UniProtKB/Swiss-Prot annotation:
It is found in: Cell membrane. This is UPF0182 protein Moth_1139. The keyword Amino-acid biosynthesis does not apply. Belongs to the UPF0182 family. It comes from Moorella thermoacetica (strain ATCC 39073 / JCM 9320). The chain crosses the membrane at residues 8-28, 51-71, 103-123, 165-185, 201-221, 245-265, 277-297.
C-alpha cells in the first residue's frame, strides 16, 4: 500500500516539477534578458497587466458561477421523502452520496473549473484594456455617430470583450444551474407546482432575462460596427446599413429588453404562452429586421439607383481611406514628359546618371555568394540598397552583411563546442556601387574581403556580427577557448577573437547554468568545463525575433537593412502601427485599414542593443503605445546624425500606399464609382514572367529642386493598359523625409510604360538577334529590373542585361539597354548606350570651378605640349565615360575644350 502511494506521489510530483521548471526557466531567462537589453519595465508592464486581467477574469467567472450555484442550494430537494421502500433510484442515490458538505465542495470545484476553462477569453486582452485607459484622440469624428476615430480603435474593442465575457458567463450559469434544478427539482423549474412561489423558476428566468438584456447591448455594439460594414459598393456604412440595418438593430435592442421583462414576469405569472410569444416575436423580428428588410432595401431601393443612394457614403469612404493610408498627404504635380534631352542637359544631371542602379539584386545575390562568401559557412541573407558619401560624393550602393550560417558548417565541425562557443559570429560586409562594373562583368567591390578592407574609405572598426538575420541559436562567449574570427590564407589558418561587447547574460553561477539548461533543454550547459566566471550567453540573436520579443505590438518589415555608421554595423528595421478598426477605410490585402511607419528600430550588430525611435509623433497609435510603455520610444532627434543619414522610406509601405492609390487618387465620387480613371502599378518582365514592379531607390534631382536627393519611386499605368500615367516618389533625405509626391503625365499624350519598352526591346532587331545568339550558345540571358528614370522633365528607361553560363552560377553584367522616346540602344555600358542615343559631340557641362591646368590657363607652352595634353584629357574622358562617371567626364571635356581653344590661338599666331 505504501509503495503504491509512493508511486502515485512520484507520478504527481515529477511531472509537476518538470512543468514548473520549464515555466520557471522561461520566466527567469526572459527576466534576465529584458534586464540586459534595458527593457525590464516593458516586461513588467506586460506581465503585471496580463496577470491582472487574467486573474480578474478568473475571479469574475468564479464568483458569478459560485454565487449562482449557492442560490440553487436552498431550492434543491436533497432530503428524500419518508418511506424508504417508496424511494426511486434517484432518491436513493441522493441519500447515499449527496451531503451538504460534498455539494459545497462540488460547487467550488465546478466554479473554479468553469473559471479556468473560460479564462483564455482574456488572453492578450490586457493591451485592449491598456489602450482603453490611455487612448489618444485622432481629432477626427466619424460621419455616422459623430464619435472620434479613437473610440472605434481603442474603446469599442473593450466593449466587445466585455460583451463576450458577459454572454459567456450568463450562458454558462444558465446551463449549470439549469442542470442542477432539472436533476434535483424539475417540477419547480418547469413551473408545474401552481400556487407556489418557485425559487428555481425565478432564478432561471432572471438569468435568461439577463441574457436578453446583454444581447440588447450587443445589438448596440453591432450598430456601432456598421462604420466597418462591407455591404455596399465601398467599405463603411452604406445606404442599406443606415436606413435599414441601423434602425433594425435599435428596434431589436428594445425587443430584447421586452423579452427579458416578459421572462421575468413569467416567473411570477407562469404564462408560458406569453414567454413563447415573446421569444417567437424576437426571432421573427431578427429575421425581418436583419435579413429581410435590408435585402429588400438593397434590391429595390439601392440597386436601381445605386450611385444616387451611395454617393454620400462613397465620399466618406474616399476621405477616410485617404487619411488612413496617408494618401491625403501626397502633393500632386504635373510632369511634362518632354522630348528635348541633349548631351548638355544630361551632363547637368551627372549625379542622377552616376547613380542609376544597374545591378539587379537577384543576380547580384549569386555574385556575392560566389565572390565574397569566401568560406562555405558564410552567407549573405539578401542585398540591401542605400546611399553613402564616398570620396566626397554621394553614391548609391548595394551591400550585404557576411553572416555565419551554422547550418553550413561541415558535418565534422558541427560539435557542441564549435556551434556554441567557437563559431559565434559573422564578419564584415560586402559593398559595390550600384552603377559600376568591372571589365569581366562583375561588381566593383569597394568594401569586402577577409579581413575587412575598403578601397573607398569606408571605416568599420567593429566588423563582427553577433546579431543578424541568420543568428538563430544561442552562443556562449567568454569561455576558456577563444572564438573563431575569420580565416586567412592557408587551409587551416584563422584568426581568433574574444567578445568584448555589452550583449549577453552572465552565466557565471551554478544556479544560472541550471536555469539555462532547462530553458534550452541542453544538459551540456551544466556539464561543460569550457565556461568561466566571465562567460555570457547570447540568445534571441535573430533581429526579427529580438524586436518582437520586446515589442510584439508593432508590425515589422520583413527586410531589415544593414547600415555602416560611426565605424560600427547596425541593422535598421521599419516598424508599423496598424489597425483594422478605422471607420470607413478600405482594408487592404493584409486585412488592416490603417498604417503608419511611426517607428524605426536600430539594432547594434555587435552589442545587440535595441533602440526604438519615434519618427512620426503625430500617430495616435504610436502615442498610445508610448503612454502604455513610458520610455520605450526615443525621439527622432536622439538618433545619431550618422544613422539619420540612412533613414529610408520603406518599400513595403510605398507598395501598400501605391496599391490603394490606384483607386483612391480619384476624389470625384462619380469617377470613383465608375472606376473611369483607375490605375495599376506598372508591370515589368522578370525572367519570363510578367509582374508588378517593386518600388526602387534612385538618386536624382526632383523637378524644381536644386540638388539631387535619394528617393523611392514607383510608376503607374491606367488599369488594363500599358502606357504610363504617373509616378509616385517618396523623399528620404533630411527634413524632407517621408514627403510623398505624385507626378502625373499630360492627359493628351501617351507615355511609354515599362511593358511597352520591354516589348520594344524584344522587337528591336539587333538586340533581339544578340539575345537569341547568346541563348543559342549556352548562356542564360537574365534581364534585370527595368528602371524608369525621370530626368530634366523627360524619361529614360534603363535595363541591364546579365549573362550566365550554364555551367556557372556567376552572372555577368554584359549589356545595358537604354530607351528614350523612339530610340533604343544596347551597349557594353550605360555611358555607351547613352552615347549611341545622344551622340558624342556635346558641349561642355556646367561644372564647379576647378584649379586651372597650365594649358587651360594660357600659360606658356608649345603646340606639341598642348596636343599631348589634349590626348591625355581625351583618354581620361573616355575612361570615365566607360566607368559611368559622368561628372568626371564633363570635367575632362571642359578642360579639353580649353586646351583646344589654346591650340587654336597658337595656330592662329
Amino acid at each position: 500500500m505504501k509503495l503504491n502511494r509512493l508511486w502515485f506521489c512520484l507520478l504527481i510530483i515529477i511531472p509537476g516539477f518538470l512543468v514548473a521548471a520549464y515555466l520557471g526557466s522561461h520566466f527567469l531567462t526572459d527576466w534576465y534578458w529584458f534586464a540586459e537589453v534595458g527593457y525590464r519595465q516593458v516586461f513588467l508592464t506586460r506581465l503585471l497587466s496580463e496577470v491582472g486581467i487574467r486573474l480578474g477574469t478568473i475571479a469574475f467567472f468564479f464568483l458569478f458561477f459560485y454565487l449562482n450555484l449557492l442560490f440553487t442550494r436552498k431550492s434543491l430537494h436533497l432530503s428524500p421523502p419518508e418511506g424508504r421502500e417508496n424511494w426511486t433510484l434517484k432518491e436513493y442515490l441522493i441519500d447515499r452520496f449527496i451531503t451538504s458538505r460534498r455539494l459545497g465542495i462540488l460547487y467550488l470545484l465546478l466554479s473554479l473549473a468553469g473559471a479556468l476553462i473560460f479564462s483564455p477569453l482574456a488572453a492578450g486582452k490586457w493591451l485592449v484594456v491598456q489602450e482603453y485607459l490611455r487612448a489618444t484622440p485622432f481629432g477626427l469624428a466619424d460621419p455616422l455617430f459623430g464619435r472620434d476615430v479613437s473610440f472605434y480603435i481603442f474603446k469599442l474593442p473593450l466593449y466587445h470583450f466585455l460583451y463576450k465575457l458577459l454572454i459567456t458567463a450568463v450562458v454558462g450559469a444558465v446551463l449549470v444551474t439549469g442542470f442542477f434544478y432539472f436533476i434535483f427539482n424539475p417540477r419547480e423549474l418547469l413551473g408545474l407546482r401552481r400556487g407556489h412561489f418557485s425559487r428555481p423558476l425565478v432564478h432561471f428566468s432572471t438569468l435568461v432575462a439577463l441574457l436578453f438584456l446583454i444581447q440588447a447591448w450587443g445589438f448596440r455594439l453591432q450598430a456601432l460596427d456598421l462604420v466597418r460594414s462591407s455591404r455596399g459598393v465601398a467599405f463603411g456604412a452604406s445606404y442599406t446599413d443606415i436606413h435599414a440595418l441601423l434602425p433594425g438593430y435599435n428596434i431589436l435592442g428594445w425587443v430584447a429588453v421586452a423579452c427579458g421583462l416578459i421572462i421575468v414576469l413569467n416567473a411570477f405569472r407562469r404564462n408560458l404562452k406569453l414567454v413563447s410569444a415573446g421569444i417567437l416575436s424576437f426571432m421573427a423580428a431578427y429575421f425581418l429586421l436583419v435579413i429581410a428588410v435590408p435585402l429588400a432595401v438593397q434590391k429595390f431601393q439601392v440597386e436601381p439607383n445605386e450611385f444616387a443612394r451611395e454617393e454620400p457614403y462613397l465620399r466618406y469612404n474616399i476621405n477616410f481611406t485617404r487619411r488612413a493610408y496617408g494618401l491625403d498627404r501626397i502633393t500632386i504635380q504635373e510632369f511634362p514628359a518632354l522630348d528635348n534631352l541633349t548631351p548638355a542637359s544630361l551632363r547637368e544631371e551627372g549625379a542622377t546618371l552616376d547613380n542609376i542602379r544597374l545591378w539587379d539584386y537577384r543576380p547580384l545575390e549569386q555574385t556575392y555568394s560566389q565572390l565574397q562568401e569566401i568560406r562555405s559557412y558564410y552567407s549573405f541573407k539578401d542585398i540591401d540598397v542605400d546611399r553613402y558619401t564616398l570620396d566626397g560624393r554621394e553614391r548609391q550602393v548595394m551591400l550585404a552583411a557576411r553572416e555565419l550560417d551554422q547550418n553550413k558548417l561541415p558535418d565534422r565541425a558541427r560539435t557542441w563546442i564549435n556551434e556554441k562557443m567557437r563559431y559565434t559570429h559573422g564578419y564584415g560586409l560586402a559593398m559595390n556601387p550600384a552603377n559600376t562594373v568591372t571589365a569581366g562583368g562583375q561588381p566593383e567591390f569597394i568594401a569586402g574581403d577577409l579581413p575587412f578592407h575598403s578601397s573607398a574609405g569606408l571605416q568599420v572598426n567593429e566588423p563582427r556580427i553577433y546579431y543578424g538575420e541568420l543568428t538563430g541559436d544561442y552562443v556562449i562567449t567568454g569561455g576558456t577557448a577563444a572564438e573563431f574570427d575569420y580565416p586567412v590564407t592557408g587551409e587551416d589558418n584563422f584568426v581568433e577573437t574574444r567578445y568584448q561587447g555589452r550583449g549577453g547574460v552572465p552565466i557565471n553561477t551554478p544556479w544560472r547554468r541550471l536555469v539555462f539548461a532547462f530553458r534550452f533543454h541542453d544538459y551540456r550547459l551544466l556539464m561543460s568545463n569550457g565556461l568561466t566566471p566571465q562567460s555570457k550567453i547570447l540568445y534571441y540573436r535573430n533581429i526579427q525575433e529580438r524586436v518582437r520579443k520586446i515589442m510584439p505590438y508593432l508590425r515589422y518589415d520583413a527586410d531589415p537593412y544593414l547600415v555602416v555608421a560611426g565605424g560600427r554595423l547596425y541593422w535598421f528595421l521599419d516598424a508599423y502601427t496598424i489597425t483594422n478598426m478605422y471607420p470607413y477605410s478600405e482594408p487592404n490585402s493584409g486585412g488592416f485599414n490603417y498604417i503608419r511607419n511611426s517607428v524605426k528600430v536600430v539594432i547594434d550588430a555587435y552589442n545587440g542593443s535595441v533602440d526604438y525611435y519615434l519618427v512620426d509623433p503625430g500617430d495616435p497609435l504610436a502615442q498610445t503605445l508610448a503612454r502604455i510603455f513610458p520610455g520605450l520610444f526615443k525621439p527622432r532627434e536622439d538618433m545619431p546624425a550618422g544613422l539619420q543619414q540612412h533613414l529610408r522610406y520603406p518599400p513595403d509601405l510605398l507598395s501598400i500606399q501605391a496599391q490603394m492609390l490606384t483607386n483612391y487618387h480619384m476624389e470625384n465620387t462619380m469617377l470613383f464609382y465608375n472606376k473611369e480613371d483607375a490605375w495599376s502599378i506598372a508591370e515589368e518582365m522578370v525572367g519570363d514572367k510578367r509582374q508588378a514592379m517593386d518600388p526602387y531607390y534612385t538618386l536624382m534631382r526632383l523637378p524644381g529642386e536644386t540638388q539631387a536627393e535619394y528617393i523611392l519611386m514607383l510608376p503607374f499605368t491606367p488599369a488594363r493598359k500599358v502606357n504610363m500615367i504617373a509616378w509616385l516618389a517618396a523623399r528620404n533625405d533630411g527634413p524632407h523625409y517621408g514627403q510623398l509626391l505624385l507626378y502625373q503625365f499630360p492627359k493628351n499624350r501617351s507615355i511609354y510604360g515599362p511593358m511597352q519598352v520591354e516589348a520594344r526591346i524584344d522587337q528591336e532587331p539587333r538586340i533581339s538577334q544578340q539575345l537569341t545568339l547568346w541563348d543559342q550558345h549556352g548562356s542564360q540571358v537574365i534581364r534585370g529590373n527595368l528602371l524608369v528614370i525621370p530626368i530634366k522633365g523627360s524619361l529614360l528607361y534603363v535595363e541591364p542585361i546579365f549573362l550566365q553560363a550554364q555551367e556557372s552560377k556567376l552572372p555577368e553584367l554584359r549589356q545595358v539597354v537604354v530607351a528614350y522616346e523612339e530610340k533604343i540602344a544596347m551597349a557594353d555600358t550605360l555611358a555607351g548606350a547613352l552615347q549611341v542615343i545622344f551622340g558624342t559631340q556635346t558641349p561642355a557641362p556646367a561644372a564647379s570651378p576647378q584649379p586651372p591646368s597650365q594649358a587651360a590657363t594660357g600659360s606658356p607652352g608649345n603646340l606639341s605640349e598642348l596636343i599631348k595634353e589634349a590626348n591625355r584629357l581625351y583618354s581620361e574622358a573616355q575612361d570615365r565615360l566607360k566607368q559611368g562617371d559622368w561628372a568626371g567626364y564633363g570635367e575632362n571635356l571642359k578642360k579639353l575644350e580649353q586646351v583646344l581653344q589654346e591650340m587654336g590661338q597658337k595656330v592662329a599666331e
